[in-house]
UniProtKB/Swiss-Prot annotation:
CDD domains: AdoMet_MTases (cd02440). This is Ribosomal RNA small subunit methyltransferase G. Pfam families: GidB. The lineage of its organism: Bacteria, Pseudomonadati, Pseudomonadota, Betaproteobacteria, Burkholderiales. One of its GO terms (cellular component) is cytosol. It comes from Burkholderia vietnamiensis (strain G4 / LMG 22486). NCBIfam families: rsmG_gidB (TIGR00138). Its EC number is 2.1.1.170.
Length: 228
């Protein structure tokens, strides 16, 4: 059985969707950043069959459910210009590649345990010319500052990676003083929050509005005690 082909969509259509979506999110992109994001969508579609990156094949839905979904967290994270960011369970590079494109002053590290996904991420770093992006393969709980990663991170983010309590347990040792863990979720994860480990607490819960997407989205910020 042959794989179902993605529908052809004119780049101008995607560009207008991106312009409208970023305007709704109050995000201003340069022409270069907009083209990088559109190139990323095209590359996701091109290499999806090889790397098994996403079940979504329609470029319009990729733009909405991957790019705009990832962009929706930017207004809540962009308080500083030089942040060190770790994207855990990054898969096809979401949200980390999007963050690296729109926040060029950030140093973004993508992490996944699957070598094939890391290979795609490395390819995207080269093709999109993202000098502020790095890739590390392995389990997040095994990463050590000064070893697999150079130092701890100001922000550790994930998108559909794991149960919130598990995410915090696995990644808390990589949070820099004053830093936070940020989890992108669908419906509000009350049960997951109730299971948060000792020494961690929800700092804020943000209901996200993703343009053109009729679905619940939440961003949960978790602070962890430095002693843990």
């Amino acid at each position: 059985m042959t794989a179902r082909r993605a529908p052809a969509v004119n780049r101008d259509v995607l560009e207008q969707m991106l312009i409208d979506g970023t305007a709704a999110l109050d995000i201003v992109l340069t022409d270069a950043q907009r083209n990088q994001l559109l190139d990323y969508v095209a590359l996701l579609g091109k290499w999806n069959a090889v790397y098994n990156l996403t079940a979504i094949r329609d470029p319009r839905q990729m733009l909405i459910q991957h790019i705009l979904d990832s962009l929706s967290i930017v207004p809540h994270l962009r308080g500083r210009t030089d942040a060190r960011v770790l994207d855990v369970g990054s898969g096809g590079g979401l949200p980390g590649i999007v963050l690296a494109i729109v926040q060029p002053g950030w140093q973004v590290t993508l992490n996944d345990i699957v070598q094939k996904k890391s290979a795609f991420q490395t390819q995207m770093r080269a093709e999109l010319k993202l000098t502020n992006l790095s890739v590390v393969t392995g389990r997040v709980e095994s990463l050590q500052p000064g070893g697999e990663v150079p130092e701890k991170f100001d922000m550790i983010v994930s998108r559909a990676f794991a149960d919130l309590s598990d995410f915090v347990k696995l990644a808390r040792h990589l949070v820099a003083p004053g830093g936070s863990i940020w989890a992108m979720k669908g419906v509000h994860p009350d049960d997951e929050i109730a299971r948060l480990p000792e020494g961690s607490r929800v700092k804020q819960t943000i209901r996200l509005a993703v343009p053109m997407l009729d679905a619940e989205r939440h961003l949960i910020e978790v602070a962890v005690d430095e002693a843990n």
